[in-house]
Amino acid sequence: MSGIIDASSALRKRKHLKRGITFTVMIVGQSGSGRSTFINTLCGQQVVDTSTTILLPTDTSTEIDLQLREETVELEDDEGVKIQLNIIDTPGFGDSLDNSPSFEIISDYIRHQYDEILLEESRVRRNPRFKDGRVHCCLYLINPTGHGLKEIDVEFIRQLGSLVNIIPVISKSDSLTRDELKLNKKLIMEDIDRWNLPIYNFPFDEDEISDEDYETNMYLRTLLPFAIIGSNEVYEMGGDVGTIRGRKYPWGILDVEDSSISDFVILRNALLISHLHDLKNYTHEILYERYRTEALSGESVAAESIRPNLTKLNGSSSSSTTTRRNTNPFKQSNNINNDVLNPASDMHGQSTGENNETYMTREEQIRLEEERLKAFEERVQQELLLKRQELLQREKELREIEARLEKEAKIKQEE
C-alpha cells in the first residue's frame, strides 16, 4: 500500500506551485520517548541534541519545567520543492507530578498564534512580512508500553485536540514484537474511541474526494497510531543499498525507513508531501475559524475552558491517584457504600454539589474569557501605540530630510 502514498504524493504536488512552503509541527512526548531522535530522523540531519533529562528511579525531583524550543530546517525533495519546516520541541513535558502547567503552556502557545492572526486580520493595513506561526500538526509520542493510553495521554489529547491536529505515534516501536505492537495499536485506538478523543484521522469530504485520495486516507486511518523507529546513526551498507539511517543490534542493522517494520516513511510522506496542504487547510478553515468565531462571540474558545481547575496528573502511570471528579476515565467511584446506606441524602447532596459545581464552572469560564479578551484588547492597544510611534518617528525623519534638502538647495543657489 505504500505505493498508493507515493502516487498520491506525486498527484498532489502537481496541484500546487513549486514555491517555498512553510509548515509548523510540534513534537510532544515525555522524556525518553525519542523526541530528539525522531526530529533528527525526520529532517535527515542532526538538528537537536539527544535528551539527557530522563528521570532516574532515585530522582526525587517532582517539578520539571516544560520548555518550548523552536528549530527551523529547510528541506528540499528530489523535485526541488522547498519546505521551511518549523519544529517545536517540548522537553520537560510529562516529567512532573503536576503536569497541568505543561498543558497550559502548550495551549497558551497555540492560542497565542491564533490571536496573532486574529490581530493581523483586524488591521487596516496588514504587514506583508507577517509570519504565520500557527501549529499545523502536533505529533504526540506514546511510549511503547504494550497497553493502552495513560491518563496523561488521554488528558492531553482531550484538552488540546480542539486546537491543533493531533496525530498519535508509538515511538520506539522496535521494542515490541509484531504481536505486541498490533495489540498496542488496537488498545490505543479503543481508548481513543471510548473517550471520544479528538485526533486528526485524515478527514475528507465524501462528495469531493477522488477515489485515489479516498483509498489513501482510509489506508492511513488503518495505521493509526503510527509506529515509528528513529536513529541518529548513519551506516554505509555498500553495494546497491548504499547509506541507510538505522539502528545497530547484535544480529544486524535495522533500517528505520523500511516500511515493512516501521511506519516512519509513510508518516513522513503524509506530513511533508501528501497531506501537508490538508493539514494547513484544516488548521485554517476548521480549527482557526472555530477559535475565531468563539473568540469574537465571547463563547468558550475550547472545550477545556469549561472544566474546573486542573488537578495533578501523574505523568508516569495510568493508575494515578488523581481526584478530578467526572473527568478521570481511569478512576472508579469509591462512594458505593455511602449510596447504599443513605441514598436520599446522597442524591440531595449530589444534586446540590453538581449545581454548585456547574455554577462555579460557569463563573470560571466567564472569568477566563474576560481575562483573555482583556489581554487581547491590551495587545491591540499596544500594537496601535507602537504603530503610532513609528508613524510619528517616520514623519519626523521625513521633515528632517525635507529641511536638509531645502538647505542644500539654498546653498547651491547661493553658489
UniProtKB/Swiss-Prot annotation:
Gene name per UniProt: CDC11
Natural source organism: Saccharomyces cerevisiae (strain ATCC 204508 / S288c)
Domain commentary: The coiled coil domain is required for the interaction with CDC3 and BEM4, but not for interaction with CDC12 or with itself.
Protein name: Cell division control protein 11
Biological function: Septins are GTPases involved in cytokinesis that assemble early in the cell cycle as a patch at the incipient bud site and form a ring approximate 15 minutes before bud emergence, which transforms into an hour-glass shaped collar of cortical filaments that spans both sides of the mother-bud neck. This collar persists until just before cytokinesis, when it splits into two rings that occupy opposite sides of the neck. The septins at the bud neck serve as a structural scaffold that recruits different components involved in diverse processes at specific stages during the cell cycle.
GO molecular-function terms, A-Z: GTP binding; GTPase activity; identical protein binding; molecular adaptor activity; phosphatidylinositol-4-phosphate binding; phosphatidylinositol-5-phosphate binding; structural constituent of cytoskeleton
Entry's family note: Belongs to the TRAFAC class TrmE-Era-EngA-EngB-Septin-like GTPase superfamily. Septin GTPase family.
Modified residues (N-acetylserine): S2
Miscellaneous field: Present with 9280 molecules/cell in log phase SD medium.
Annotated region (G1 motif), positions in chain: 29-36
Positions of the UniProt region annotated as G4 motif: 171-174
Alphabetical list of Pfam families matching this protein: Septin
InterPro entries the UniProt entry points to: G_SEPTIN_dom, P-loop_NTPase, Septin
Record's compositionally biased regions (Polar residues): 329-340, 348-359
Chain residue ranges for the region called Disordered: 307-360
Swiss-Prot/TrEMBL keywords: Acetylation, Cell cycle, Cell division, Coiled coil, GTP-binding, Isopeptide bond, Membrane, Nucleotide-binding, Phosphoprotein, Ubl conjugation
Septin-type G domain location: 19-298
Main location: membrane
Binding residues annotated for GTP, in chain numbering: 29-36, 92, 172-180, 230, 247
Region G3 motif: start-end pairs: 89-92
Phenotype when changing N40E: Temperature-sensitive; no effect at 23 degrees Celsius but loss of function at 37 degrees Celsius; abolishes interaction with itself
Residue list for modification Phosphothreonine: T327
Lineage of producing organism: Eukaryota, Fungi, Dikarya, Ascomycota, Saccharomycotina
